[in-house]
Amino acid sequence: MSAWDVWTLSYLFGFQIYFDFSAYSHIALGTARLLGIRFPENFNYPYAATDPKDFWKRWHISLSSWIRDYLYLPLIGAKVISRSEGGLGNQVVEKRRSNENKGLFLSWGIMGLWHGANWNFLIWGLYHAAVIYGYRKFKERSKRVAINDKIACAMTMPIMMLGWIPFRAESVDHTMNMWLLIVTPASYLDTLGLRENAYLVGLLLVLGFFAALRLKKPLFSVVKSEIRPIAQAIGVLFFACLLVLV
């Protein structure tokens, strides 16, 4: 296995878990709307995020906001004066700076173990804690540096994709070996191990990028304005065909 294989597989799994998870979340949202119930969005184009913190504001919003409100904020001694629907919109009026880092790593460690009681999930949680901590320090030391959103997105996506390795790997050794390949220059000299299916893999990656990034309009707006009228027309034609057959 080469570094190219690791990158390819991490991107493919990152797209797979996003499409799988967000798909049945949207199925639940759509089913609820048929019954006149509106649930908050659980995914908001996470791979369009411009930094790690922004990613977790967009990914599995119900869980990440719950962890933030009921675990992270209490751990850092934050006082919250209001909560909006879904745990979003907290107003923090006081917090202890010294507790932020401890709360960050502890809450992410717990979040990792919540996904599964093994070392790989703990590593997954601590990886994201370290990434968020590193980004926080970067912002503190480069407040005057302005980065274009597209460039920031291009820098954020590979960092988040590498975080899926411990989530999917079979063991800690497997995780460490794959990460080691990423930082080993010689491993980039090897060819892609998936070269027999290179065209298919390339097509899947391109489709994944286009499907994962932000649309100009929110998904439900597209469905309502463009797909819904077509669906209604098809429904009328289908009913007319039934009448003719009867």
For the regions a language model picked out, list residue spans one by one.
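Membrane-embedded transmembrane alpha-helical bundles that form the catalytic cores
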Residues: 1-209, 217-246
